[in-house]
Amino acid sequence: QEVMFRNQFEMWRHRKDFDLYLTVDHADETWDGEEGLVTKPFEHLEIDPTNTFGALCGPPIMYRFVVQEMRKKDIPYDRIYMSFERHMKCGVGKCGHCQVGHQYCCIDGPVFNYWEAKNIQGSM
């Protein structure tokens, strides 16, 4: 029913130099995008891997499956970015709430490329 940043998504959807693929688990009658698993759009996705970046935001368990699909499309690991959404309490790395492995999302992230993330224990 509600999608965050809907206005921005609509703006991106109409750009000629940008392709946006959105999917939701369960859609209502107002949704005009994909419905199902987040990996579903990869079934019909045709891309140029040398001109493609992937940006992931969601639960960490999802990242493993989406990265597998991106790799099937030959998207290089260094072009896959993921956001580690953690509760950032202090914002300066003192409280440890946002710590993932040896990294602090408030200082070192929250966005990491795959090469950085794969070595962070507990990230995916």
Feature locations, PLM:
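Local cysteine-cluster metal-coordination motifs and their immediate loop/turn environment
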Residues: I61, E85-P110
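Alpha-helix termini
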Residues: R71, Y104-C106, G122
